[in-house]
Regions:
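Acidic donor-binding segment of Leloir-type glycosyltransferases
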Residues: 1-34
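Active-site loop/turn elements of alpha/beta-hydrolase fold enzymes
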Residues: 11-13, 89, 176
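Glycine-rich, basic loop-to-helix element that forms the pyrophosphate-binding segment
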Residues: 34-50
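Conserved glycosyltransferase catalytic-site signature
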Residues: 40-45, 62-63, 70, 128-133, ...
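Active-site acidic short loop of glycosyltransferases
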Residues: 51-54, 145
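Short beta-strand-to-loop acidic/aromatic patch adjacent to the donor-nucleotide binding site
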Residues: 53-64
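Conserved catalytic core of nucleotide-sugar-dependent glycosyltransferases
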Residues: 66-149
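C-terminal catalytic/acceptor-binding lobe
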Residues: 127-128, 148-231
Length: 231
């Protein structure tokens, strides 16, 4: 069994979400933020530092995974075989609106979805790195955590994997797919504007072109400017 806590952060001008259940292991935080752009990386770093566990999962609210894959991914970090671990093998399937509604109503389950998996759209090819992942909390924060230079939607999923690769830190993938629920695409599901798109793309290119020593210095300088202690 796994002792687990869930942390949810809402950033907006006014709170819109209320927890449906009361549980001492579920924590919800509201941050007043008038910006229309959600600074996801900054808030994820905050949640990561608040988390009490040694292993932290970062999870999009619109994805589903079989329990066995989640446990396999956690186990890889527990055993010291990975610093970052994905609870799926890279296949990221987009569910249509109809099946997403059936799942929400509990008229369809994960097993039934997986049986018809090849009817769904395989987004981003067979090697996706978005949606959900686990990390060794202390090691991940030491090597930069989430890159707060990404403001709004951007290629931060690819950047964190590239950073682990340059630093020589092991990544694990569990066997099996990830399912993405249908939802309308709003402002924070795509680049906010051309300026932000350019800045976020350039940040990925900047990191991807660094040597290990250059990246370590960049991480140290960046974390100092964000007020994150990585010592």
């Amino acid at each position: 069994s796994i002792r687990m806590e869930i942390r949810i952060l809402e950033a907006d001008e006014h709170p819109h979400y209320e927890l449906k259940i009361s549980d001492e292991h579920i924590h919800k935080t509201f941050v007043r933020d008038a910006s229309p752009v959600f600074h996801r990386t900054k808030y994820l770093n905050r949640l990561m530092q608040e988390a009490e566990g040694a292993i932290v999962g970062i999870w999009d609210t619109d994805v589903l995974l079989p329990k066995e894959q989640i446990l396999e991914a956690v186990d890889a970090i527990r055993k010291g075989n990975a610093v970052m671990s994905f609870p799926y093998d890279g296949r990221f399937y987009m569910l249509p609106q109809e099946d997403s509604l059936l799942l929400k109503k509990r008229e369809m389950n994960m097993e039934e979805c997986c049986q018809k998996i090849y009817e769904y759209v395989l987004a981003h090819g067979p090697n996706s790195v978005g949606g959900a992942f686990w990390v060794n909390k202390n090691v991940y924060i030491k090597y930069g955590g989430e890159n707060q230079h990404f403001y709004g939607w951007g290629p931060e999923d690819a950047e964190r994997c590239k950073r682990m690769e340059i630093l020589g830190l092991p990544i694990y993938r569990a066997q099996g797919p990830l399912l993405h629920l249908f939802h309308p695409r709003m402002q924070n599901s795509w680049f906010g504007n051309q300026r932000l798109e350019y800045a976020n793309r350039m940040e990925f290119i900047r990191v991807a072109g660094m040597t290990r020593s250059q990246l370590l210095q960049y991480i140290w300088l960046s974390c100092n400017s964000w007020g994150i202690n990585i010592c």
